[in-house]
A protein has these predicted regions:
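Domain-level signal for soluble alpha/beta catalytic cores
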Residues: 1-292
Length: 292
C-alpha cells in the first residue's frame, strides 16, 4: 500500500508541475522566463544543504570514506575521456549536419552512431524557433551532489601527492575507551569526508598530558573527545595548557554541550564537531587551518 500511496503522491506533484508549465505557455516560454531554472536551483540548493550536513548520505564521499581507495582512471574511448578529445562513438570525428528539431531525427542520428554531444550541438545550431529569432535562456549548470565534498577530497589528495603523507588531525581522547570512543569514532568518520586522517591515541588521564601530546604531535588541529559531563573539568584545563606551548593550534570539541558552548569558546575552543554540524563548512575550515 505504501508504494502505491507514494506513487500516487509523486504523480500528482508531477502533474501539478506540468500544469504550471502549460499555464506559462509551454516549456519554451517557461525556460525563457526562468521559472523552471528557479525551481531546479532551489531543489539543488536544498539537496546540497542536506548533503553538507550529512543528512543525505553519499557513501564513500560524505559518509564511510575509504582513504585507502585508489582513484579510478577513465578507460580510453569512454564518454568521460571524450571530454579530453577522444572519441566516444564511431562517428565522433565526423561533423554532423544540422538536425531537425524532432525526436525522429535525433533518434535516427543516434542509431547511426553519433554521440549525444554532437547531436545536441547540431540541434542547437538548427534552432530558430521558426520565427527567425534565436532562443536565449538561462542555462542550467552541470552539477553533481557529491562535487563539493569531492573538491575537499581532491585537495587532500593533492597534499598527499606533494607531501607524501595524508594531512593529520590529533585526537585528545580522554579517559577509558568507553568515555571517548563513541565521539572519537564519529569525529574520525566526519573528518574523512575531507580526506583527513587522525592520530588516535589511547585515552589520556589528565588534560595536561593530552595537551602536551597534542602540542608535540606536529598537527595543526586537535579534537577533544570525551563526554558532556566531563567536559567542564577537561576543556578549560586542556586549552590553558595547550595555549602555553601551541597558541596557534586549532581546538575542536567533539559534541555540542549547549549549556557550555560560550564558556568553552572563551576557554579556547574554535569549532565543534557534532551530528547537526555543517560537515562541509567545518571540514573546509579545518583544511584551511592545516594549509590545504
Amino acid at each position: 500500500w505504501y508504494l502505491e500511496n507514494l506513487t500516487d503522491e509523486a504523480s500528482r506533484k508531477i502533474w501539478e508541475f506540468f500544469q504550471g508549465i502549460e499555464k506559462e505557455g509551454g516549456i519554451v516560454k517557461a525556460l525563457k522566463a526562468g521559472s523552471i531554472q528557479k525551481k531546479v536551483n532551489a531543489t539543488a540548493a536544498k539537496r546540497y544543504e542536506l548533503a553538507d550536513q550529512r543528512r543525505q548520505s553519499i557513501v564513500g564521499v560524505n559518509q564511510y570514506v575509504n582513504l585507502a581507495e585508489k582513484k579510478l582512471e577513465a578507460p580510453e574511448g569512454s564518454c568521460c575521456s571524450a571530454h579530453k578529445g577522444h572519441g566516444c562513438c564511431k562517428n565522433a570525428d565526423i561533423q554532423l549536419p544540422e538536425v531537425e528539431m524532432s525526436v525522429d531525427s535525433a533518434c535516427k542520428a543516434a542509431g547511426e552512431g553519433f554521440s549525444t554531444c554532437l547531436i545536441n550541438k547540431a540541434l542547437v545550431a538548427g534552432v530558430d524557433c521558426k520565427c527567425g529569432e534565436p532562443l536565449e535562456m538561462e542555462a542550467l549548470p552541470k552539477r553533481r551532489l557529491a562535487e563539493r565534498f569531492e573538491s575537499l577530497l581532491a585537495k587532500a589528495d593533492a597534499w598527499v601527492e606533494e607531501k607524501g603523507s595524508r594531512p593529520m588531525v590529533f585526537f585528545a581522547n580522554m579517559g577509558p575507551l568507553r568515555q571517548h570512543k563513541a565521539r572519537a569514532d564519529f569525529s574520525r568518520d566526519f573528518l574523512r569526508a575531507g580526506g583527513l586522517d587522525v592520530v588516535y591515541p589511547s585515552g589520556f588521564q589528565t588534560p595536561e598530558d593530552a595537551a602536551r601530546a597534542a602540542a608535540e604531535s606536529g598537527c595543526a588541529v586537535c579534537v577533544i573527545c570525551s563526554t558532556d559531563d566531563t567536559y567542564p573539568e577537561i576543556v578549560p584545563a586542556f586549552c590553558k595548557a595547550l595555549r602555553e606551548t601551541r597558541p596557534d593550534m586549532m581546538v575542536a570539541l567533539a559534541g555540542y554541550p549547549a549549556d557550555y558552548v560560550e564558556a568553552f569558546k572563551e576557554a579556547g575552543v574554535d569549532i565543534f564537531i557534532h551530528v547537526k554540524a555543517n560537515c562541509y563548512n567545518t571540514v573546509e575550515a579545518i583544511q584551511n587551518k592545516i594549509g590545504l
